[in-house]
């Protein structure tokens, strides 16, 4: 399959993101994964960390992962990040239809995404599934289902723990935690 794109706020990136991406590499014949931080997600509140800080956290988290890269087209556009618009750019830049890694929850609501009908014509999807949920298959979407490890960690929980002075050891890479503490990110979020 080659390459895939893993979009998200990454506010902050955590071990769950990294392990899911590694599982996709191993289970779905993907050589490279480009983590693609959204400037602003159309479905989430504005990130707390700045685009520059989230990019730096990704760099620190992924620097020892030879299969992991960062694609910053959405950060550079400085607008709400719509997957369809990014897919058009990625298709031209990489000369192939982009493959996006999405969670099963996102797959179930894909029809609510901006220009969904156009998106599914130009992009492929790897749907990461945790556990034994029944699979609903939408035949309009070119998707591969990938059972990944269940890692119950969320960026929201990490931000709250940091805000209240609780440990996030083993939840995020040490270098990312050092950066967060040095920058004072999430201390008063």
UniProtKB/Swiss-Prot annotation:
GO terms for molecular function: ATP binding; nicotinate-nucleotide adenylyltransferase activity. GO terms for biological process: NAD biosynthetic process. Pfam families: CTP_transf_like (PF01467). It comes from the Bacteria. It is an enzyme of class 2 (transferase). Pathway: Cofactor biosynthesis; NAD(+) biosynthesis; deamido-NAD(+) from nicotinate D-ribonucleotide: step 1/1. Keywords: ATP-binding, NAD, Nucleotide-binding, Nucleotidyltransferase, Pyridine nucleotide biosynthesis, Transferase. Its EC number is 2.7.7.18. It catalyses: nicotinate beta-D-ribonucleotide + ATP + H(+) = deamido-NAD(+) + diphosphate. InterPro entries: Cyt_trans-like, NadD/NMNAT, Rossmann-like_a/b/a_fold. Belongs to the NadD family. Catalyzes the reversible adenylation of nicotinate mononucleotide (NaMN) to nicotinic acid adenine dinucleotide (NaAD). This is Probable nicotinate-nucleotide adenylyltransferase.
């Amino acid at each position: 399959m080659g390459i895939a794109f893993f979009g998200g706020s990454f506010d902050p990136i955590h071990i769950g993101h990294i392990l899911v991406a590694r599982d996709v590499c191993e289970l779905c014949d993907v050589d490279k994964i480009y983590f693609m931080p959204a400037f602003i997600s159309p479905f989430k509140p504005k990130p707390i960390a700045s685009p520059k800080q989230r990019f730096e956290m990704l760099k620190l988290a992924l620097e020892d992962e030879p299969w992991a890269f960062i694609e910053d087209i959405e950060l550079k556009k400085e607008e709400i990040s719509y997957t369809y618009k990014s897919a058009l750019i990625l298709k031209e830049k990489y000369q192939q239809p982009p493959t996006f890694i999405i969670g099963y929850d996102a797959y179930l609501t894909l029809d609510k995404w901006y220009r969904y009908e156009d998106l599914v014509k130009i992009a492929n999807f790897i749907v990461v599934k945790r556990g034994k949920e029944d699979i609903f298959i939408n035949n309009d979407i070119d998707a591969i289902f990938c059972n990944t490890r269940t890692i119950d960690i969320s960026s929201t929980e990490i931000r709250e723990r940091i805000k209240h002075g609780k440990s996030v050891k083993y939840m995020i890479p040490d270098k990312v935690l050092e950066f967060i503490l040095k920058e004072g990110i999430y201390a008063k979020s």
